[in-house]
Swiss-Prot record:
The gene is secA. Residues 561-571 have a biased composition (Basic and acidic residues). ATP binds at Q87, G105, E106, G107, K108, T109, D512. It comes from Pseudomonas putida (strain W619). It is a peripheral membrane protein. Belongs to the SecA family. Zn(2+) binds at C895, C897, C906, H907. CDD domains: DEXDc_SecA (cd17928), SF2_C_secA (cd18803). This is Protein translocase subunit SecA. InterPro entries: Helicase_ATP-bd, Helicase_C-like, P-loop_NTPase, SEC_C_motif, SecA, SecA_DEAD, SecA_motor_DEAD, SecA_preprotein_X-link_dom. Its EC number is 7.4.2.8. Part of the Sec protein translocase complex. Interacts with the SecYEG preprotein conducting channel. Has a central role in coupling the hydrolysis of ATP to the transfer of proteins into and across the cell membrane, serving both as a receptor for the preprotein-SecB complex and as an ATP-driven molecular motor driving the stepwise translocation of polypeptide chains across the membrane. May bind 1 zinc ion per subunit.
Length: 911
């Protein structure tokens, strides 16, 4: 009630922050005259001076005014660009670990240099994160002269980079790269077998460009490093033949069935579900095709994998459409980012869905994969000591940035007031009427000599729009995922007089559309242009620039609303940069996805009440409000999904931190002999407790089982029963001491044979391999648990609490298995001395082989049998090799090794 009054009296929080920072801006400006008087050498020497002052105890905050003044003066001398006062506020916002929302064309890249320079002085490294390789290279090479003038080094990380080059890039003061590459390198570092193999230093400070795209849009897709699994292509092909025989079950809103069928589709949640008739029908078809045994249920535990394949096939056919969610290019299914319209090479959908789409499109089906390491952007970026970001659209997601990442959003005032006109939406009854109105608007704008940008949500819509324009004989350029390699060229001239560009949501994000076209791109296209040619090109551009401004600037037309207001705002933001004139208009129809699913009833009733006729449009603030309300509803649902994903991944993340800390400590340790000795005692105690329960009577002891377990775990045969028969003074405690001594003595003999140094090195290698293999299997188990945990809700249990409880139990079992399996392997192997050169060559071969099998994805992967611990050329010879029958052992059956334990408690743990 009093909030508007208080806001009027004291200003909003954002306004108060701007006022606070303006005081610092005045101090920076006061340094300007002094900086102008310095020579280049004196200005460059300021960097060394700042580092020295930091070492003596000054803070970055204390250095900020003078450091910003130095960076501003260097920008003038090197780049010919002086930071505006509002850009100084943007730099302070980034330094304070906040998100700076700045409109298109306000110079975000230049703003970043202020905070990056200041924080690079600490010597701990700064990461500048972009959405793609093109922007990373462009920005790094653009700003490199400025940083190098100030005595700072700049590196760029990219995929398929030689390791030495990548390490040098991370060792630089400032490192540019994509969010994917930073995340994957973090995972690779935690798979390294030595400290020298690691790439990243401590995660100190990151500036994320297009922060909303990375921390919001990408948050739902985990980063996965995976290895290939077994081939199931025949199964996908068989399932693909069956799916078209299923029909959709359709009910009207009142519950009246209009079409009997086998499955239902929920467009809001993008889910497809088999009904009872569908289950029976699919079981019959699977039985007939020989995929399901006679009388078997699809819901039997051993058939759940088959059920997953059926659902993958259903989703591939009914929810994923070519040229909307994916395209087919060079025999591969390339996913399309719904937020940017760009293809995502290398990304694959999880749970067999990608393979099901390949089967649907009659392509070569690639093998499934198993997760080797994974994380999410949410958890990766929260590892940085300080995080900040820049974007043109963040305020609509301010609550999520604050609640998930602890980042406040600061709206930076524009250097020049916005002159763009944003017209109300026009809503039509049908899509055909909408497209006719769009073409009429295009013709009118082009007649005026204005450039026009038409934004579409999908490739399908952009190509439909292109076909309509061809029929009208209107010249245009198309920019979508199919033609992304021409993106920079098309966007460069999208602001030329009368230019017409059709673009999916990507709309050349990160590249400004300059009114009149881009004269620098014209110069770059010439070979060795003369000064006269450059001057002529610039003069011609100036005329075109003025012509476009006088005609009204860039006109943005949107063919539909996106689910997110932020994406709509990004499209609008292509026009009206730096105070330029411009306009935007959204054209909608009741047949659009968003309107049909979320907003149609209210708007449809309103249109009926007005008695609208075909071809007429409604333009009313109430309609625009109804649509924005629908968008807020979708945004809220998507936020809940991201938050839920984070809550589940937080459980895995705590475990990930423990395992990675254990791994890093192991890599840093020179001698892990004491750790192995502790493992040995703990494993022995657990083994004894299993067969000789504490404080039990001798009659309850399972001596034969204990002898078998010791032979299995420690590769030692001890006559325990004979000892007990011969020595009346041998009771539980003294027996423990005797067993520990025998096992330790046996291991010490191995140490004498191999040499202490060789065995210590070998212990570290084995522990690393066991830890990695079991962690890999644990990730797969956690995936399966996560995907089925929602069913606990039917038993009146809280799925989240159940997941936490069961994952904790699984993690405890993992830690015990790491100890037991490490001791088992070390006890069974025979170690020989190896030539250091041979050893180094072997380790390099193994690392290269592992790297060649890796895939880098953004989707969880199903399980795979663990790789053998010993490889050809390794220095191990396993004394006991598993001998298996053709029939697979059940998890509760006695283990094949003769230990007397159940398979799941013995070799089943590592297989």
């Amino acid at each position: 009630m009093f909030a508007p009054l208080l806001k009027k009296l004291f200003g909003s929080k954002n306004e108060r922050e701007v006022k606070r920072m303006l005081k610092t801006v005045n101090i920076v400006n006061a340094f300007e005259e002094k900086m102008v008087a310095l020579s280049d050498e004196q200005l460059r020497a300021k960097t060394a001076e700042f580092k020295e002052r930091l070492a003596k105890g000054e803070t970055l905050d204390q250095l900020l005014p003078e450091a910003f003044a130095v960076a501003r003066e260097a920008g003038k001398r090197v780049m010919g660009m002086r930071h505006f006062d509002v850009q100084l506020i943007g730099g302070m916002t980034l330094h304070e670990g906040m998100i700076a929302e700045m409109r298109t064309g306000e110079g975000k890249t230049l703003v970043g240099t202020l905070a990056v320079y200041l924080n690079a002085l600490s010597g701990k490294g700064v990461h500048v994160v972009t959405v793609n390789d093109y922007l990373a290279r462009r920005d790094a090479n653009w700003m490199r002269p400025l940083y190098e003038f100030l005595g700072l080094s700049v590196g760029i990380v990219s995929a398929f980079q030689p390791p030495e080059e990548k390490r040098a890039a991370y060792a630089s003061d400032i490192t540019y790269g994509t969010n994917n590459e930073f995340g994957f390198d973090y995972l690779r570092d935690n798979m390294a077998f030595s400290l020298e193999e690691k790439f990243q230093r401590e995660l100190n400070f990151a500036v994320i460009d297009e922060v909303d795209s990375i921390l919001i849009d990408e948050a739902r897709t985990p980063l996965i490093i995976s290895g290939q699994a077994e081939d199931s292509s025949k199964l996908y092909i068989e399932i693909n033949r069956l799916i078209p025989r299923l029909t959709q079950h359709i009910e009207e809103v009142e519950g009246q069935v209009t079409q009997e069928g086998h499955f239902t589709i929920d467009e809001k949640s993008r889910q497809v579900e088999l009904n009872e008739a569908g289950h029976q029908f699919i079981e019959e078809m699977l039985t007939q095709s020989g995929l399901l045994a006679e009388g078997e249920s699809l819901y039997s535990s051993h058939n759940l994998g088959l059920l997953t394949h059926v659902y993958a096939g259903l989703r591939a056919h009914k929810l994923f459409h070519r040229n909307v969610e994916y395209i087919v290019q060079d025999g591969q299914v390339l996913l399309i980012d719904e937020h940017t319209g760009r293809t995502m090479p290398g990304r694959r959908l999880s749970e067999g869905l990608h393979q099901a789409i390949e089967a649907k499109e009659n392509l070569n089906i690639q093998a499934e994969s198993q997760t080797l390491a994974s994380t999410t952007f949410q958890n990766y970026f929260r590892l940085y000591t300080k995080l900040s970001g820049m974007t043109g659209t963040a305020d609509t997601e301010a609550f999520e940035f604050q609640s998930i990442y602890g980042l406040n959003v600061m709206v930076i005032p524009p250097n020049k007031p916005l002159a763009r006109k944003d017209f109300n939406d026009l809503v039509y009854l049908t899509a055909d009427e909408k497209y006719a109105a769009i073409i009429a608007d295009i013709k009118e704008s082009m007649t005026q000599g204005r450039p026009v940008l038409v934004g579409t949500a999908t490739i399908e819509t952009s190509e439909h729009m292109s076909n309509l324009l061809k029929q009208e004989g209107i010249e245009h350029k198309v920019l979508n995922a199919k033609y992304h390699e021409k993106e920079a060229e098309i966007i460069a001239q999208a602001g030329a007089p009368g230019a017409l560009t059709i673009a999916t949501n990507m709309a050349g994000r990160g590249t400004d559309i300059l009114l009149g076209g881009n004269w620098e791109a014209e110069v770059a296209a010439l070979e060795n242009p003369s000064p006269e040619q450059i001057a002529q090109i610039k003069a011609d551009w100036q005329k075109r620039h003025q012509q476009v401004i006088e005609s009204g600037g860039l006109h943005v037309i949107a063919s539909e609303r996106h689910e997110s207001r932020r994406i709509d705002n990004q499209l609008r933001g292509r026009s009206g940069r730096q105070g330029d004139p411009g306009s935007s208009r959204f054209y909608l129809s009741l047949e659009d996805s968003l309107m049909r699913i979320f907003a149609s009833d209210r708007v449809k009733n309103f249109m009926k009440a007005l008695g609208m006729q075909s071809g007429e449009a409604i333009e009313h603030r109430m309609v625009t409000n109804a649509i924005e309300k629908a968008q807020r509803k979708v945004e809220g649902r998507n936020f809940d999904i991201r938050k839920q994903l984070l809550e589940y991944d937080d459980v895995a993340n705590e475990q990930r931190k423990v395992i990675y800390h254990m791994r890093n400590s192991l890599l840093a340790a020179e001698n892990i002999g004491d750790t192995i000795a502790e493992f040995r005692q703990e494993v022995l105690d657990a083994t004894i407790n299993q067969h000789i329960p504490p404080q039990s009577l001798p009659e309850q002891w399972d001596v034969a089982g204990l002898e078998a377990s010791l032979a299995s775990d420690f590769a030692i045969k001890l006559p325990i029963q004979q000892w007990l028969d011969e020595d009346d003074h041998l009771y539980e405690e003294t027996l423990r001491e005797k067993l520990l001594k025998e096992i330790t003595d046996a291991y010490n003999e191995k140490e004498d044979q191999a040499g202490i140094d060789a065995l210590r090195t070998f212990e570290k290698q084995i522990l690393l391999r066991v830890l990695d293999d079991l962690w890999k299997d644990h990730l797969s188990t956690m995936d399966h648990l996560r995907h089925g945990i929602h069913l606990r809700g039917y038993a009146q249990k809280n799925p989240k609490q159940e997941y936490k409880r069961e994952s904790f139990t699984l993690f405890q079992e993992l830690l015990e298995s790491i100890k037991r399996d490490t001791i088992r392997v070390l006890s069974h192997v025979q170690v020989r001395r190896e030539d250091p050169v041979e050893e180094e060559a072997r380790l390099r071969r193994e690392a290269e082989e592992l790297a060649s099998r890796m895939q880098f994805q953004h989707a969880p992967a199903p399980g795979l049998e663990s790789e053998q611990l010993s490889e050809e050329g390794a220095e191990v010879a396993v004394a006991v090799a598993p001998v298996r029958n053709d029939q697979k052992l059940g998890r509760n059956e006695p283990c094949w090794c003769g230990s007397g334990k159940k398979f799941k408690h013995c070799h089943g743990q590592i297989e």
